[in-house]
């Protein structure tokens, strides 16, 4: 049996994780010096509502390698022969390192994989291989599909402000300050572990139009999730406005606080897998 592990930055809804037997390790947010588990100790809605008024900026932290080791041990006790542990890019997070440190205790029975993606750009990779694993597919078949989905996954988002990116140190203070004064709506894409700038728009309305254009350019899609940070109405309106062929069972997801801490509330975007 091949077991699948990921972490909460994958944004896989609980019901899908349960359906496809995916084990998810929660990540950590530090609020006023107190560590809380993403999606467990505080809801995402509450977190994003509080974020603009927090006097001290919250920080993100990686779950300990001990949490991963405990998860791996439980899965082996339940009969797993091999574990695939799929995580956010090592260049963006310490999650990959924590999982890798834990995996050393189990030799080649645990494979830790850099997805090159975040949120459901990673989550769709995990879901694809979890379905195959339940069907009893071979490790080689599963790894081949994982690489295929990885190459076709895209995550693009419009931020409502540069303020939270500036706090995180992802851009220079001057650039973030100017962007905030001009009310720019920056666009970013995550691909192969890199965060790429796709420019900006002056207004949210134009930004949503541009986001739609970026999605259309990708062509036929296999999977689609509309991502937001406490902007569910905008996310659902965006989904309903699409005139392209929308894949079956699209998701609308309020993304992980670990990512949203650095992007801020009212963000809007999408994760997709381009049809092969």
Feature locations, PLM:
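A short glycine/small-residue-enriched secondary-structure motif
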Residues: 43-47, 78, 100-105
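Alpha-helix boundary/capping residues
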Residues: 51-54, 75, 149, 218
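Glycine-rich phosphate- or other oxyanion-binding loops that anchor nucleotides, phosphorylated ligands
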Residues: 55-56, 62-93, 97-98, 143
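A general structural signal for short secondary-structure boundary/capping elements
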Residues: 49-54, 72-73, 130-132, 273-274
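Local beta-strand N-terminus motif with an aromatic residue
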Residues: 1-2, 80
């Amino acid at each position: 049996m091949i077991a699948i592990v990921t972490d909460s930055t994958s944004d896989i809804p609980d019901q899908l994780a349960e359906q496809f037997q995916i084990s998810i390790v929660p990540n950590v947010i530090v609020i006023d010096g107190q560590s809380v588990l993403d999606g467990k100790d505080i809801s995402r809605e509450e977190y994003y509502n509080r974020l603009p008024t927090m006097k001290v900026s919250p920080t993100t932290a990686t779950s300990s390698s001990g949490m991963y080791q405990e998860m791996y041990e439980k899965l082996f006790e339940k009969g797993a022969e091999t574990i695939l542990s799929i995580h956010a890019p090592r260049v963006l997070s310490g999650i990959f390192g924590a999982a890798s440190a834990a995996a050393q205790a189990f030799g080649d029975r645990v494979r830790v994989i850099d997805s090159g993606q975040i949120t459901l750009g990673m989550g769709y990779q995990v879901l694809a291989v979890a379905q195959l694993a339940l069907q009893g597919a071979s490790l080689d078949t599963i790894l081949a599909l994982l690489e295929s989905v990885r190459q076709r996954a895209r995550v693009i988002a419009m931020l409502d402000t540069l303020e939270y990116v500036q706090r995180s140190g992802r851009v220079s203070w001057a650039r973030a300050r100017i962007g905030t004064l001009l009310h720019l709506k920056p666009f970013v894409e995550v691909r192969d572990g890199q965060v790429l700038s796709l420019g900006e728009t002056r207004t949210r309305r134009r930004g949503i139009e541009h986001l739609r254009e970026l999605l259309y350019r990708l062509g036929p899609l296999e999977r689609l999730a509309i991502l937001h940070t406490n902007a569910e109405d905008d996310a659902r309106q965006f989904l309903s406005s699409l005139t392209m062929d929308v894949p079956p069972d699209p998701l609308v997801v309020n993304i992980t606080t670990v990512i949203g801490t650095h992007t801020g509330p009212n963000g809007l975007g999408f994760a997709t897998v381009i049809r092969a």
